[in-house]
Amino acid sequence: MPTNKHMKKKRLIFGIIALQFILFPTFAQDKLLGILKTELHQQMQELQKKEFPPYHMNYRVIDKHSSYVAASFGALMTQSAQHQRHLVTQVRIGNPSFDNFRNRDMGAIPSQNGIAATPLPIDDEGAEDAIRQAIWFETCNRYRFAVDFYQQALAEHSIQVGHEDKAPCFSPNQVEKYYEEPFSSEKIKEISAIFNRDDKIVNGNAAFKYYVERRYFVNTEGTEVVQNLPYALILVSGTTKADDGMELPLSLTYFAHNPDS
């Protein structure tokens, strides 16, 4: 018959494993890549009809998943999961030697933390139309900013001839194709197995944080890059008593960029 000690440990491990179904039900990121490629192609074609057609465009998406679970004396106390996604759009007007980035490092109005990013819906299956609408809307905004700053750059160029930086604004690179499979939720089970080897957990507190940032990049030259940036953090603290009654605390922290390590 299982002891109370073992039951507490099982509840803690079960809570951590169960979090995978909250945090990573299924990665549908392959569909997102297809949406980005299709929208980029369509928007580039449509903007070629404008007075100032772009010569280069790219989309960058940062898709963040994070989870946190904490337990005390084997009982689950807190668990949470977050998922957010942002799009950064770049539109270049002119040519590689002179474009809207000439006098603007960001090529458009930046936010406090750099170039402005816009939120994207996180449901690839149920909100595909909303994702496409958000991409289209942001591309239109970036294009308008690009035209404004390109015209400003032309005006400044006309009065600064001979005194401005001659370096090109853009250097084309070779086309890259790189794809990483979505990070498997099975990793959580493997990571949580560490608790099976440490009985001290049932006498104290444990916290587990898991984070995956999945990045997408596509451009009009044909580059496609999809990669994962994961990390795991486990904090364990416990207290035991020596034979003489003295309390002996123990705190351990485990961190890894790659949870396999």
Predicted regions and their residues:
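Active-site bordering "gate/hinge" segments
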Residues: 27-261
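Bacterial N-terminal signal peptides
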Residues: 15-23
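Intrinsically disordered, low-complexity peptide-like regions
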Residues: 2-4, 23, 28
